């Protein structure tokens, strides 16, 4: 009996170390950032079982076997669709401004199409205005409505949008609604899904959370896009979820969420439609390729229309493209660079690009919320402040609520707006979308919004920052070390 016990003990110890060695080798063999690899190895060696379980659950990008197969299967038809779209040469811009040209060339080579011209674009900063405009557009819809959101929170004006969507479905409009399972948990626990399905709306719970499959697919991989397409002609995207700020997270102690949305008319809606069709096929297996744009209803020609590129990220989409786009934008800046984000945990490359821009004389400003709904990210972001301030970057702490807008403005002409936070999760993991806009008029509108944010912010004083308590510095460095994992 003693011999058997000894043998089992030795086998258990051997298996334990083989497991650690195997996971270590897997981490080292994966092409990943050194800080991320080092953080994972430290966790595994300090808390082996916890670290191994955590790594197997969220350490690698697992879309899941079924979705991965769908993603591979959809790309031949998607590539053909994009190639056919090139025949509509009149919708593509032949040239860009000097500040936007490098980014637009990058997107064209990575995604296969040039920037789309001839669009009407409206910047919207008030949730009531967004929802009222959306309700009007839904009421006027003639053919189809496609919607995807990370969060749909019942209550307030969100319910009015739901009612208008159901009314559209009842009068024969083909309505599709895709919501993230984790972000919209309150919605899926409410009566709304059944009501919508009974009205004729196709409702899909994207990336459904299932703890029984935690090792088969990353549960923290989320559908973070916010997009609405109506009749393949009108489109919305931006940072706003389908929530009424007066009813959303009122007990979080951060105030109302402050967002920005863009409403578009024109052929750019088709480019956004192919992104939605890819997401829909990955989730449902059904193919819904959008029709080509109607050449007869372009609202503006090149002389007055906004030129836009859609940049999509997530498993199955061009790898690292949004990260590359942000780096390109930062290095293209010659006069000023303004960035707004609720969550700031940049990669080393992005941090270096921002600091380098400031050090070569570019006026660089970053606007962040003073109070954050994520304690971990809030502390981790503070760990970057010293380096940013030393480089000459201005850090504004917004005091008018939780600033949730994600935007970048370069030299007043190149704008980036969408769903991407400046953190690891948005840059490397989630399904995201960003609009790259080459237009001085839109740049002026975005600059006015950012100036309003700055007027409601407090500029961080570098001298006072250096006098912060020691325990603050310790907490910042602790969370900074784990920032590659956030």
From Swiss-Prot:
Pfam families: PLDc_2, PLDc_N
First-listed, main subcellular location of the protein, grouped into a coarse class: membrane
GO biological process per UniProt: cardiolipin biosynthetic process
Sequence intervals crossing the membrane: 3-23, 38-58
Active-site residues, Swiss-Prot/TrEMBL: 224, 226, 231, 404, 406, 411
GO cellular component, one term: plasma membrane
UniProt keyword annotations, A-Z: Cell inner membrane, Cell membrane, Lipid biosynthesis, Lipid metabolism, Membrane, Phospholipid biosynthesis, Phospholipid metabolism, Repeat, Transferase, Transmembrane, Transmembrane helix
GO molecular function, one term: cardiolipin synthase activity
Highest taxon, organism lineage: Bacteria
Compartments, as annotated in UniProt: Cell inner membrane
PLD phosphodiesterase domain boundaries: 219-246, 399-426
EC number, UniProt record: 2.7.8.-
Catalytic activity field: 2 a 1,2-diacyl-sn-glycero-3-phospho-(1'-sn-glycerol) = a cardiolipin + glycerol
Protein family (similarity comment): Belongs to the phospholipase D family. Cardiolipin synthase subfamily. ClsA sub-subfamily.
Function: Catalyzes the reversible phosphatidyl group transfer from one phosphatidylglycerol molecule to another to form cardiolipin (CL) (diphosphatidylglycerol) and glycerol.
HAMAP family: Cardiolipin_synth_ClsA
Protein name, entry field: Cardiolipin synthase A
Organism: Shigella boydii serotype 18 (strain CDC 3083-94 / BS512)
């Amino acid at each position: 009996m003693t011999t058997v016990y000894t043998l089992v003990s030795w086998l258990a110890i051997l298996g334990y170390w083989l497991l650690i060695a195997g996971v270590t080798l897997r981490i080292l063999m994966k092409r990943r950032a050194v800080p991320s690899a080092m953080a994972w190895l430290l966790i595994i060696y300090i808390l082996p079982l916890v670290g191994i379980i955590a790594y197997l659950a969220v350490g690698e990008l697992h879309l899941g076997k079924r979705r991965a197969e769908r993603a591979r299967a959809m790309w031949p038809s998607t590539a053909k669709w994009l190639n056919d779209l090139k025949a509509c040469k009149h919708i593509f811009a032949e040239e860009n401004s000097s500040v936007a040209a490098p980014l637009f060339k990058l997107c064209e080579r990575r995604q296969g199409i040039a920037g789309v011209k001839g669009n009407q674009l409206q910047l919207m900063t008030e949730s009531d205005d967004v929802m009222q405009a959306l309700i009007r557009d839904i009421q006027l819809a003639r053919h189809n409505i496609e919607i995807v959101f990370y969060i749909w929170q019942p209550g307030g004006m969100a319910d009015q949008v739901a009612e208008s969507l159901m009314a559209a479905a009842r009068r024969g409009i083909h309505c599709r609604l895709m919501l993230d399972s984790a972000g919209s948990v309150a919605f899926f626990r409410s009566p709304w899904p059944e009501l919508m399905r009974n009205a004729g709306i196709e409702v899909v719970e994207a990336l459904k959370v299932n703890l029984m499959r935690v090792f088969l697919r990353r549960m923290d991989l989320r559908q973070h896009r916010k997009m609405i397409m109506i009749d393949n002609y009108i489109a919305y995207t931006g940072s706003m979820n389908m929530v009424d700020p007066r009813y959303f997270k009122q007990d979080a102690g951060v105030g109302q969420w402050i967002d920005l949305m863009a409403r578009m008319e024109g052929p750019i809606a088709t480019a956004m439609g192919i992104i939605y069709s890819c997401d829909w096929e990955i989730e449902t297996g059904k193919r819904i390729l959008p029709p080509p744009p109607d050449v007869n209803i372009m609202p503006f020609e090149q002389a007055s229309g906004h030129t836009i590129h859609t940049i999509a990220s997530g498993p199955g989409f061009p790898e690292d493209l949004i990260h590359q786009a942000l780096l390109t934008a930062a290095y293209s800046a010659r006069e000023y660079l303004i960035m707004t984000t609720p969550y700031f945990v940049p990669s080393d490359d992005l941090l270096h690009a921002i600091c380098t821009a400031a050090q070569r004389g570019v006026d660089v400003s970053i606007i962040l919320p003073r109070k954050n709904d994520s304690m971990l990210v809030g502390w981790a972001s503070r760990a970057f402040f010293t380096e940013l301030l030393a480089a000459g970057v201005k850090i504004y702490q917004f005091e008018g609520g939780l600033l949730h807008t994600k935007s970048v403005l370069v030299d007043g002409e190149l704008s980036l707006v969408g769903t991407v936070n400046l953190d690891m999760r948005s840059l490397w993991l989630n399904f995201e979308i960003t609009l790259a806009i080459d237009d001085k008029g839109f740049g002026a509108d975005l600059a006015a919004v950012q100036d309003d944010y700055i007027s409601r912010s407090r500029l961080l004083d570098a001298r006072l920052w250096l006098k912060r308590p020691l325990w603050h510095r310790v907490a910042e460095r602790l969370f900074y070390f784990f920032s590659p994992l956030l």
